Amino acid sequence: MNIHEYQGKEILRKYNVPVPRGIPAFSVDEALKAAEQLGGPVWVVKAQIHAGGRGKGGGVKVAKSMDEVKTYASNILGMQLVTHQTGPEGKKVNRLLIEEGADIKKELYVSLVVDRVSQKIALMASSEGGMDIEEVAAHTPEKIHTLIIEPSTGLTDADADDIARKIGVPDASVAQARQALQGLYKAFYETDASLAEINPLILTGDGKVIALDAKFNFDSNALFRHPEIVAYRDLDEEDANEIEASKFDLAYISLDGNIGCLVNGAGLAMATMDTIKLFGGEPANFLDVGGGATTEKVTEAFKLMLKNPNVQAILVNIFGGIMRCDVIAEGVISASKAVSLNVPLVVRMKGTNEELGRKMLADSGLPIISADTMEEAAQKVVAAAAGK
């Protein structure tokens, strides 16, 4: 689950990480009141969406008068903000963060993620923070320092000080940087985050260390023990189909292609999408019905896929281990009739009750295209989507 910048800063504040004073605003009037409450002479008007790259996309503006606050708030609120993380369709801006300006002397970068290789927590930091951190990672990776943290030990004073010095924090500000780094680590660990990022972490002209931005992503599997995090959820930022899918315990992610995919198991789902692309097709979604799919779940899965007007064909790829092929066949038949299926449907089933499932499909009278291997299924669905 993602949250907005201003919500991330609320979390950082609780963990004693210095952040600028700021007030969220949902209208131009609220933006002006926020600016007045903060006082001048400089404010930053920041679009709040669940995506990075807002500055380059025109979603962050520095205002030096109340008139500029009004102009920028009017322009940004309601705009369709396009960044490298939103896709070409962009995201609509429904809320702003009005923040006091800061005297930026140096921009740094720091983030925490779960490192799957070491099965520990990785802290990454760089002296080159700001809007071009992706370029730094791509072209000068030596400027990014990584520290693997043992969770039972945490981020020690010595390690925090060492990282701070490596990214160019002067001795006079190292203690402040240590406080910020350890606060970020504690926030990451105690909230079950999967990502915590400050970009930039700034040094001001008078030597202060301040988190000028905050990005958090949380492990959805741990949200049951964090109602305070769930309260931050903004459904307007989420795909409506993905929200609907979660109600039926379906793992669904919208994509840009024209071939709907219904698969059991995340690994098989990814392999299926790769195979579709191998034969020149483009998946319209990732959809994992899991190991306990019912007829109802399969029907809802079909409804979700067909809500996408770009879908020209559907591939059902099932490995019947825990999931029986006859149950999937029953669901496919029921779903096809319930949604009045009007696009080609390719079905490939292997495993438990495979022959029974195939017979049920063959006897259904529905125009279902059968396939024996994943490669054959991918080739057939790509051809069907192309009208061949």
Swiss-Prot record:
Q: Which reaction does it catalyse?
A: succinate + ATP + CoA = succinyl-CoA + ADP + phosphate; GTP + succinate + CoA = succinyl-CoA + GDP + phosphate
> What EC number(s) does this enzyme carry?
6.2.1.5
Q: Which GO MF terms does the UniProt record name?
A: ATP binding; magnesium ion binding; succinate-CoA ligase (ADP-forming) activity; succinate-CoA ligase (GDP-forming) activity
Output one GO BP term.
Answer: succinyl-CoA metabolic process
Q: Which domain of life is it from?
A: Bacteria
* Positions bound to Mg(2+): 199, 213
- Annotated NCBIfam families: PRK00696.1, sucCoAbeta
What are the UniProt keywords, alphabetically?
Answer: ATP-binding, Ligase, Magnesium, Metal-binding, Nucleotide-binding, Tricarboxylic acid cycle
Matching entries from PROSITE patterns are given as: ATP_GRASP, SUCCINYL_COA_LIG_3
Per UniProt, ATP binds at: 46, 53-55, 99, 102, 107
The cofactors named for this UniProt entry are: Mg(2+)
Q: In which pathway does it act?
A: Carbohydrate metabolism; tricarboxylic acid cycle; succinate from succinyl-CoA (ligase route): step 1/1
Q: How does it assemble?
A: Heterotetramer of two alpha and two beta subunits.
Entry-linked InterPro entries: ATP-grasp, ATP-grasp_succ-CoA_synth-type, ATP_grasp_subdomain_1, Succ-CoA_synthase_bsu_CS, SUCC_ACL_C, Succ_CoA_ligase-like_bsu, Succinyl-CoA_synth-like
Pfam families with a match to the protein in the record? ATP-grasp_2, Ligase_CoA
Query: Could you tell me what this protein does?
Result: Succinyl-CoA synthetase functions in the citric acid cycle (TCA), coupling the hydrolysis of succinyl-CoA to the synthesis of either ATP or GTP and thus represents the only step of substrate-level phosphorylation in the TCA. The beta subunit provides nucleotide specificity of the enzyme and binds the substrate succinate, while the binding sites for coenzyme A and phosphate are found in the alpha subunit.
Q: Which GO terms describe its cellular component?
A: cytosol; succinate-CoA ligase complex
Tell me which residues bind substrate: 264, 321-323
Top enzyme class of this protein? ligase
Regarding protein family, the annotation reads: Belongs to the succinate/malate CoA ligase beta subunit family.
| Cofactor binding notes | Binds 1 Mg(2+) ion per subunit.
Residues in ATP-grasp domain copies: 9-244
Name the UniProt record assigns to this protein: Succinate--CoA ligase [ADP-forming] subunit beta
